[in-house]
Amino acid sequence: MITARFVIRTLRREWRLPELRTLIGALLLSVVALGAVATLAARVQRAVVMSAAELIGGDLGINAATPLSAEFVQRAHALGLRTSALAEFPSVAFVNDRSQLLQVVAADAAWPLRGKLVLARHDGADRSMHAPSAGQIYLDHRALVALGLATGERVQVGGVDLVITGEIEQQPGGGDLVALAPRAVMALADAKSAGLLGTGSRARHRLLVAGAPTPVAAYRAWAKA
C-alpha cells in the first residue's frame, strides 16, 4: 500500500528534476497570461460599449420615422431606466438678408444621457450642458460665421424666433460625416410648436435610454420582440 510518506518522498525527488520545474513554471505562466488577456478583453469591451453610448447620447437608441408611442417610455421607466426624446432634421436659419441650412437636433431637457454636450467658453474652459430651454438655441462655429451672429443675438429657425445662448463645441453624434451642414441644438418643445415635426417632415425621431446593463438588455429584448 502506498503511504503518504512515500508519496511525499517521490514528489520531493521529482521536484528536483529541472524538466518538471520548467513545465510547472510554464503552466503557471500560461494561467497568469490567460487571466491577464481575459481581463484586458473585458476592459476593452467595456470601453467600446462606453464609447458607443457616448456617441449616440445613451446606452440604447431606438430610431423611428414617427414619434414612438408612450408605451416605450413607460416600459423603460418601469425597468428603472432614464429616457430622453429627440428628433433630427434639416432646417434653414434666417437673419436679416442671410440664410443657412442647418442640421438640427431638437431634444428634451434630459439629453444627452451619456456623453457630453459642450459649449465653447472664451476663457478656454469646457461647459457641459443639456439641451437648451424653450426659446433658446445653440449653434456651432460654422453656423455663427455663416450667419454673421454671436451668442446673445437672435435667429429664426422654422418660423420660431430664438436666442443664441451657446456655441456648440462638442455634441453626441457630432462626428457624423453625413451631416455636412452646420449644427444646431434647440428645445424639442419649440420644434413641436413650430410644426417642424409634423406630417411630411424629414425628421428622424429617436428615444434614448440609459441605466444599468441588465435592465438595458431587458429593454432591448422587449423592444425587439
Regions found by a protein language model. Name each.
Residues 2-225:
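Membrane transport/envelope proteins' first extracytoplasmic loop
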